[in-house]
A protein has these predicted regions:
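Canonical P-loop GTPase G-domain recognition
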Residues: 114, 123-181, 185
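Conserved C-terminal guanine-recognition region of P-loop GTPase G domains, centered on the G4
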Residues: 52, 76-144, 217-219
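Conserved G1/Walker A P-loop phosphate-binding module
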Residues: 1-77, 81-83
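Catalytic P-loop NTPase motifs of RecA-like helicase/translocase cores
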Residues: 40, 64-65, 98-99, 125-126, ...
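Conserved, well-folded catalytic cores of nucleic-acid-processing
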Residues: 28, 47-51, 63, 82, ...
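P-loop NTP-binding site
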Residues: 185-293
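Active-site glycine-centered loops adjacent to acidic/histidine catalytic or metal-binding residues
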Residues: 59, 120, 150
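Conserved glycine(s) of the Walker
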Residues: 17, 156, 247
Length: 293
C-alpha cells in the first residue's frame, strides 16, 4: 500500500478551537489552550505518524481582521504562509459562529486544494443549531466537506482523520518516524509560562508579554531554566509581579509544575520581569522574539 504524507493546515478565527483539535488528534499537548483569543501566536507543527502515513498538522494563530500592532501583523503573516504549502485545509468554525462569507479567507473561497470545514465545539450546541450551520456553510463553501466534531469529547475525530488521509497525496515522510513537532523544548517552556500568564492575569497584561528562555541546562536529574518575561510598559511590570511578588510566584509555581510534566524530571525555574518598551511595534524586538525573519 503506498505511503501517504502531507501538510494539513488549520485555519480559523481566534478561539475557534484550532489548538484543541490538533492536540486531540495528535494525542499530545503541543499548543497551549486558554479561553482568551489570540492564545496562539506562532505557527506550530504537530506530527501524527501511523501505519502507512504521516500527517503534518499546522496550528496557526487566529485570523485578526484589524491588527492593532506589528505583532498582530506578523501573526497574520504566519497564516498567509499556511495558505502556500497545504495539501489539505481544515477551516474551523465553532458552532456559535454564524456562517458568513466575510469570515472565510479569500484564499479558501475558490481553492482547488481539498477543503474540510470543521464545525467545532458541537458539544456546546444542539441538533437544530448544527443542522442550521451545516446548511449555511454548505451554501457558502459548496466544495468543502463538512464534518462536525467535538475535540473535548473526541466525537468524529477518527472520521475526520480518515477524511484527511483520503485527501493526502502519496509521498515519503517529511520527518523522522518518531518526530512529534519541529519545535524545541525551549519553545514549549516559553509557551507553558505564557499560558499561565494568560490564565492568571486579565485585561492587557496577557497580550503585552513575551517570554524568552535565556538559559536551559538539561542535567540528568534536573533541568535548570532561567526565563525572562518582557512587558511593554513599566506599570505592567508591577502588576505582573504583584504584592511582594505573590502574583509572579503563583505563575512560576504553576509553570514549573507543567514544565516538570513536559520534561519528565525536576525543574528549577527562575523568572525575571523586564520592560521592553512597546515591543509589539518594535521591529528589532519582533525579530528577536521570532515574529519576523
Amino acid at each position: 500500500m503506498p505511503f501517504k504524507s502531507g501538510f494539513v493546515n488549520i485555519i480559523g478565527k481566534p478561539n475557534a478551537g484550532k489548538s484543541t483539535l490538533m492536540n486531540a488528534i495528535i494525542g499530545e499537548r503541543l499548543s497551549i489552550i486558554t479561553p482568551k483569543a489570540q492564545t496562539t501566536r506562532h505557527r506550530i507543527v504537530g506530527i501524527l505518524n501511523g501505519e502507512g502515513f504521516q500527517v503534518v498538522f499546522s496550528d496557526t494563530p487566529g485570523i485578526i481582521k484589524d491588527p492593532a500592532y506589528r505583532l498582530q501583523e506578523s501573526m497574520n503573516r504566519f497564516i498567509e504562509g499556511s495558505f502556500q504549502d497545504a495539501d489539505v485545509f481544515l477551516y474551523l468554525a465553532e458552532i456559535g459562529q454564524k456562517p458568513r462569507k466575510e469570515d472565510i479567507p479569500e484564499q479558501l473561497q475558490d481553492t482547488t486544494i481539498p477543503l474540510i470545514l470543521v464545525i467545532s465545539k458541537i458539544d456546546t450546541g444542539n441538533q437544530a443549531m448544527l443542522e442550521e450551520h451545516v446548511s449555511g456553510w454548505k451554501a457558502l463553501l459548496p466544495q468543502a466537506e463538512i464534518i462536525p466534531v467535538s475535540a473535548t469529547n473526541r466525537f468524529n475525530l477518527d472520521y475526520l482523520l480518515n477524511s484527511i488521509l483520503h485527501h493526502l497525496p502519496e509521498a515519503p515522510a517529511y520527518f523522522e518516524e518518531d518526530a512529534l513537532t519541529d519545535r524545541n523544548e525551549r519553545f514549549f517552556v516559553t509557551e507553558i509560562i505564557r499560558e499561565k500568564i494568560l490564565l492568571n492575569y486579565q485585561k492587557e497584561i496577557p497580550y503585552a508579554v513575551e517570554v524568552v528562555v535565556d538559559e536551559f541546562k538539561d542535567e540528568p536529574q534536573i533541568a535548570k531554566i532561567s526565563a525572562i518575561i518582557f512587558v511593554a510598559r513599566e506599570s505592567q511590570k508591577g502588576i505582573l509581579i504583584g504584592h511582594k511578588g505573590s502574583a509572579l510566584k503563583k505563575t512560576s509555581t504553576e509553570a514549573r509544575t507543567d514544565i516538570e510534566k513536559f520534561l519528565g524530571k525536576k525543574v528549577f525555574l527562575a523568572i525575571q520581569v523586564k520592560v521592553s518598551k512597546d515591543w509589539r511595534d518594535n521591529e528589532k524586538q519582533l525579530r528577536r522574539f521570532g515574529y519576523l525573519s
